[in-house]
Amino acid sequence: MGCGTSSKKGNKSKKVIKAALVIQNWYRRYRARLRVRQHYALAIFQSIEYSDEQGQMQLSSFFSFMLENYTKTNNEDSALVTRIFDNTRRESQIKDRDDFLGLIEVPDSYDGPRLQFPLTFTDIHILLQAFKQQQILHAHYVLEVLFEARKVLKQMPNFSHVKTFPAKEITICGDLHGKLDDLMLIFYKNGLPSENNPYVFNGDFVDRGNNSMEILMILLVCFLVYPSDLHLNRGNHEDFMMNLRYGFTKEILQKYKLHGRKILQVLEEVYTWLPIGTIIDNEILVIHGGISESTDLNTLHQLQRNKMKSVLMPPVLGNQETGEKRNKSASNYVEPRKVEPDKTPSEDLTKQEWEQIVDILWSDPRGKKGCYPNTSRGGGCYFGPDVTSKVLSKNQLKMLIRSHECKPDGYEVSHDGKVITVFSASNYYEEGSNRGAYIRLSYGTMPQFFQYQVTSTSCLNPLHQRMNAMESSAFKILKEKMISRKTDLINAFELRDHSRSGRISLAEWAFSMENILGLNLPWRSLSSHLVTIDSSGSVDYMSSFDDIRIEKPTKDMKSNLTETMYRYRSDLKIIFNIIDSDQSGLISMDEFRTMWKLFNAHYKAHIDDSQIDELASIVDFNKDGNIDFNEFLKAFYVVHKYDKPGTSLA
């Protein structure tokens, strides 16, 4: 009897185990499908991010084109071009601190944080508490912090040299991009900066997020209190031209309407004095982007870093070879501005020095050997494990720690453990898209990685709902990219639709998408979200545009002009802001026509002069001869009719 009971219990246990294994296998497959969906969504976000950065770098080519082709050959346009370069390459004409700050008083009615100079730990605490309450630091204090930071930064070398000990660790943080909650979480988990708790912040403090000013002020105040224990490296977004596109300029002007321009003027110079790297224990190189086969730390140590105003304005001697074949072979190669050999302006770096800085700010590691153009971003290079070994060995270093790239887990180890990427902005693309991370290390020990993710109410939703939301956001921005090239895509589709049936094969559709958009995406896997496919596998290519359109100021505007305006709206806004030297938000009709013709000639947008003249008359809404270009560019936006329900990537 006892044996029978044991047998029944054994059978029941087997069934329970079998059921548990079935559930476990199902859950593993479910998680694997979610990982595939996350991978594809992140690929979309990253490809479009890099494509946008590529466009930003190509503005450099446009500026060079204007200078080389119009200052001498076209008298009508030369005045405008000269003014643009005067505005973008001006010497910082900043008054001394007392004169500058004397114009801005802090009223008694101001109830935000008040700082006392010289700054102490108390001021750090006051600032953190105020920003937690979403208070705004007065412009007077912002400028005072910037002036103090500039004074201290000027005394620093290009590379900060840091020593650690077994009992004294150092923390390394990557990109924060205006995400204040991430910085607060890091300080909560890891402690505030101090003599016993040093930090390295590896660039890209600003842009994209909504609290770039708060992050910058916290970091600079901490730096001023602990200048030997908090180290700030320059990233590719510590650049006033990048800020015009990616949000920090707009944030400053919104938060500091009266004194925003003064803040921007001083900030531009502070950027140029930020160190370009940190070397820990003479073994670990910490830089924002990466390296190239020509990276020379001796050159980087000796150049005058404050001459690098922006990567968009690269100088080069007219008699020097542009030589570096890796740059010329890129389809989006940025041709630097040429100046006469005997007229190199004193504020310019040499071409070699400029390239050295661009490489360490913009480059990315790859598994493939060698060094080749970073065609995704349009600046810097891709460097392989052999390049890493060569550069580290040459400089008697053991490891490279860099940032610059969002990683799903917040960090990534590559090149046989010699390269570490750390990225500290969680939820960078969308809620749940990635974790943030920071690194702790001390002398003679392996780096320790700490991950986190800022949570919000949406994080309480089921996992599949969060994934659906992330996918939906990814496909929206991908469709916006597609609609901006609608005419080109349709021409490419029709080229392969020999029977004019409106259908082509999936392979032909995928080839056309990549050929026109150049995003290096798995188009076949993404096709179910983007286009209608019949049972035979044929693609109804016009269905790509069923649920999206570009809104335009007037119905009579031609499609190619509408798409061009939408596609280049960010570039045009930067250019118009530069032209608008008095910051009125207005440019004249003549300036509009001239700039459009220059832009059209360089970008080969195939817009004839009559269309430009017609466009100019349309956008002069009140017929006063001036154009409010910000309002004009806002008139071009994408309308999503609906989202396709019930589909997923896996």
Curated annotation (Swiss-Prot):
Which tissues does it occur in? Answer: In the embryo it is almost exclusively expressed in the peripheral nervous system, within sensory neurons of cranial and dorsal root ganglia. Otherwise found in fetal inner ear and a small group of neurons in the midbrain/pons junction.
Q: Which residues form the EF-hand domain?
A: 484-519, 567-602, 607-642
UniProt keywords, alphabetically? Calcium, Hydrolase, Magnesium, Manganese, Metal-binding, Protein phosphatase, Repeat
Q: Name one GO molecular function term.
A: calcium ion binding
Q: Does the UniProt entry include the keyword Membrane?
A: no
Kindly state what the record says about how the cofactor is bound.
Binds 2 manganese ions per subunit.
Q: How is its activity regulated?
A: Activated by calcium.
Q: According to the UniProt record, where is the region Catalytic?
A: 124-456
Q: In which residues is Ca(2+) 2 bound?
A: D580, D582, S584, E591
List positions binding Ca(2+) 3.
D620, N622, D624, N626, E631
Active site, per annotation: H237 (proton donor)
Sequence segments annotated as region (Disordered): 315-348
Q: Which SUPFAM superfamilies does the entry mention?
A: EF-hand (SSF47473), Metallo-dependent phosphatases (SSF56300)
**Protein name according to UniProt:** Serine/threonine-protein phosphatase with EF-hands 1
* Taxonomic lineage: Eukaryota, Metazoa, Chordata, Craniata, Vertebrata
Gene name, please?
A: Ppef1
